[in-house]
Amino acid sequence: MRRQLSLAFSIIVLACLVSLAVVSAENWPQWRGPMLNGISNEKNLPVKWSTEENVTWKLAMPDRSGSTPIIWDNLIFLNVADGTKATGTLSFWAVDRTKGTVLWKKPLGTGDHMMRKQNMSSPSPVTDGKTVWVLTGMGVLRAFDFKGNELWMRDIQKEYGKFGLNWGYGSSPLLYEDSLYVPVLHGMRTDDPSYLLKIDKATGKTIWRHERPTPAQMESPDAYITPAVLKNGNKTEIVLSGGDCVTGHDPATGKELWRAYGLNPQNIQFNRIVNSPIAFDGLIYAGSRGNPYMAVKAGGSGDITNTHIAWTFANGPDVPTPVTDGKYLYLV
């Protein structure tokens, strides 16, 4: 989940992002970029801008959104709430990144509504350069080619039950190799179990669905995170945080490989998690609702709470996901 911004501000931010994209050759295929770490290798990018300075073009958006643009070559893809309260329409836009013109729009569904401060356009799209996938907060997942032709559609809520997050669904799907990973970590407004869903990116078919029980109560099971990919030696794991703990999962089966508690030492019942876990150089960084923030060492098995927590500190971020370059961890 990304906290909603005012409409005017979201237009300015989009213009700045596009301005950076025009001078950058690097694709930005999903939330937090090609390596899922929020870092770009491009140099000499603008560091100052206003409503006029370093802005190549502006594109007015019909409503606010918590999702981020993704970029592939000359295309920008956007998950858009159309602001039509009568129908609550969501749509998917492809934009020419050099001109700021909308190339095509495709409907994603109706029923958009506000859940506290966010609407149903919070999940960011993801692409592999040929296909682009977009998920709405209503659980509709669609695949399109770059010309806007729909390839397949899934309705996750219809298949597996309604999402039960207090602030509405806001996780972005993770694309790793040939699959999409969709986390549904909830509990405040449902008794249904949390789970991680793996979907074949080409066909849209479920490969596996792994339930993820935790002892968290009230709002604490709710998490708005996007999964991280941990590479440790010749092993790869999908990492989740939520429900008072961090877990690592086998990409082939979904099986939970390890679990570390410590994100809610005071057992607060409203400890929902917004900032996503990150994995870098043998460490997994994960936070909760500000306190604590912790680093977990890779390579564990089973309950690793007492053996693999490298460090913790208080006053971590509530919403923003940190960035690391391997030497420093940057938090807002």
Predicted feature descriptions by range:
Residues 1-6:
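Positively charged n-region of N-terminal signal peptides that target proteins for export
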Residues 22-332:
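Noncatalytic, solvent-exposed loop/strand surfaces
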